[in-house]
Amino acid sequence: VSLSDLANEQFILLERGTDDEITPLFRRAGLAVRSKLSTWDDYAIMAMVEDGLGVSILPALILRRCQFDVAVRPLEGHPHRQINAIYRTADVSLAAARFLEYL
């Protein structure tokens, strides 16, 4: 599915501070997002999509265990996001330190 295919759909956005991740993605493609609904919870978004209130773009990680009756389609261009690890250096266990080295 391309962003232009979704441009006329009503979106349910995941709030992250003052901006979501979908709006900038559309903006970079020269498109606008139509949205009236937003929430802080991925599962609430999936429930709203299941109820026919709109569509959304969610991380593949959360969709792997999706138990809602919704269609899951890959997005063209494979957009990605950066995820960071934040930790207190004084409290890192040996196992956690090894994991961070691996990253």
Regions found by a protein language model. Give the residues of each.
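Small-molecule pocket liners
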Residues: 1-3, 9-10, 80-85
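Secondary-structure junction motif
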Residues: 9-29, 93-97
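A late-sequence structural motif
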Residues: 71-103
